[in-house]
Amino acid sequence: MTAPVRRVPDVVYGEVPGYRPLELDLYLPREDRPVPVIVLVHGGGWRHGSRRHPLPVLGADFYDRLAAQGFAVAAIDYRLSGEARFPAPLDDVRTAIGWVGEHAAGYGLDTGGIFLWGDSAGGHLALLAALTGATAHGVVAWFPVTDLARLPSDVADAGGVPDPGPGSREALLLGAPASSVPGLAREASPVSHASAAAPPVLLMHGAADDLVPPAQSIRLAEALHAAGATAELELVPGATHMWNGASDTDGIVRRSVEFLRTVTPQAGAR
């Protein structure tokens, strides 16, 4: 049995002078108890994307289906690279997490189960927030960027076409190519912040991804393991970026949900 879902759209979770209001949409299961919440961070190379557009292979009702399994979902927008440079989008994710904690009682949210979930650029931001002290009891990151400095070489090694120049996605995020601002690139890379204090992390990556190669997830998993943290890594055979080519996207979602339930056994319990 799945729970019916209530939507609360266009909630302003933050306001930064000079910028558009920062908004999220809530998807709430109708439960008689506080429910864990997933802060969902969309991808798009830090320059595109919206809280209203899940990955195409998952369908437009993905957030409703996720919430129907007993999790509240807070799908957030954040400032894109055409609006503001790093660390602006990271600051926005942190602000959204703070909003969830502050407003949990009013929406029936369990602050003992705040999870981050993101894909691609959103996975990068979710990981970075969790690894730099934001409240997170677990992270699901799908095909995330984890090491900005090595992204061009990883793309080349995977048979893709690297773009190390000033118009690249990472240069637009940082304000300059990663090679020109190595200190900032390190600060903006989740792999630089691996520590024993990290929450449990699930990394899932297409084995055939040449846009954000699996080496990015492998490297972070190794760094987290070396630091004594809990990290699980799964490479999906045949899958490229955005789960194109994956034979079982429903299975990928199930694996991700079960990970969160394992991290906090009461999370999303049906």
Regions flagged by a language model, labelled:
Residues 1-270:
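Alpha/beta-hydrolase superfamily serine-hydrolase fold, recognizing
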